[in-house]
Amino acid sequence: MDKFRVQGPTRLQGEVTISGAKNAALPILFAALLAEEPVEIQNVPKLKDIDTTMKLLTQLGTKVERNGSVWIDASNVNNFSAPYDLVKTMRASIWALGPLVARFGQGQVSLPGGCAIGARPVDLHIFGLEKLGAEIKLEEGYVKASVNGRLKGAHIVMDKVSVGATVTIMSAATLAEGTTIIENAAREPEIVDTANFLVALGAKISGQGTDRITIEGVERLGGGVYRVLPDRIETGTFLVAAAISGGKIVCRNAQPDTLDAVLAKLREAGADIETGEDWISLDMHGKRPKAVTVRTAPHPAFPTDMQAQFTLLNLVAEGTGVITETIFENRFMHVPELIRMGAHAEIESNTVICHGVEKLSGAQVMATDLRASASLVLAGCIAEGTTVVDRIYHIDRGYERIEDKLRALGANIERVKGE
């Protein structure tokens, strides 16, 4: 397995170009199964999960090409089963189910894998598809969906806010007969982006970005060209990298209005922040950040995917900060690793109390999930001495060329190839 070796401490400064959002590109790639004509998707990041998705789409009979953009032609889909060997590494595969049953009347997906951070049941996806008239069976480790004729529009009230299930229901409902209303829908920018992609293909969707999305079913979706929005979590990660190292950064190809909660907390921590239409700059003027209190919650509140990075910020800040995680259980696996580097923290159920220290020391640490592993790499950039981060395949699932981008900001980081 590959590792990162990071030599610190360094002040990170310079410019970074933000990649397309993984969490929008994935649902958009799966939603392309609904289109009867070719689709061009621009600004798709080069990531392990994207490669897996492209393989999965190919296995379903879709023509997939990548040359700058990703080109998808789903006009000849002839296999309606997403097998375990591809699904096991990536839970996003469940997003194949809605489009398959909506367009072809049948689909089956092996129960998914992915990061091990708490319960992420597929129940809400199943609940939504059943409301639209699909018959669902769980057999031999597969979720199997079928319908005679077309799905039927429905008024669906979600028990809890779920990004994944909102995507499934919204994409399936585009080809359903009649109108579907999703109440308590997720409001994330990536949901809006997926909806806008579907609209570009001819879907009739309104209310995306609010908690009530309305979809008027159409008979078919055509082709089109669409550009994936910038990755707000990658943007936030690099802003934190500059903030914890006293540095100065400009993030290009960013979308500031998707990061309001994060920018507010960075300002509270003492950062000078300016924004333009597609850029964000942060300047710490060489100062240590001040500790902040953070509570994760569904968008537009503070994102759970930025929690690990802000835990690190608090651990090297002036003062004591409290971080409360309300979205996933079991999402403080980075904290014991940071304690090995000299951090002072206590975990109490879903809260971590961070007592800022002036410096961290390099150590051998292990990545446990995608965002936690990014925080360990950033910790290595500011710690004294050498840090080795093991199991970085987690990082490769969500960050495009993170070591190249950090190196351009002055980090001393190298990838050590595993056996």
Curated annotation (Swiss-Prot):
SUPFAM superfamilies: EPT/RTPC-like. GO terms for molecular function: UDP-N-acetylglucosamine 1-carboxyvinyltransferase activity. The modification 2-(S-cysteinyl)pyruvic acid O-phosphothioketal is found at C115. It is an enzyme of class 2 (transferase). It comes from the Bacteria. The keyword Cytoplasm applies. GO terms for cellular component: cytoplasm. Cell wall formation. Adds enolpyruvyl to UDP-N-acetylglucosamine. Target for the antibiotic fosfomycin. This is UDP-N-acetylglucosamine 1-carboxyvinyltransferase. It comes from Enterobacter cloacae subsp. cloacae (strain ATCC 13047 / DSM 30054 / NBRC 13535 / NCTC 10005 / WDCM 00083 / NCDC 279-56). The lineage of its organism: Bacteria, Pseudomonadati, Pseudomonadota, Gammaproteobacteria, Enterobacterales. The gene is murA.
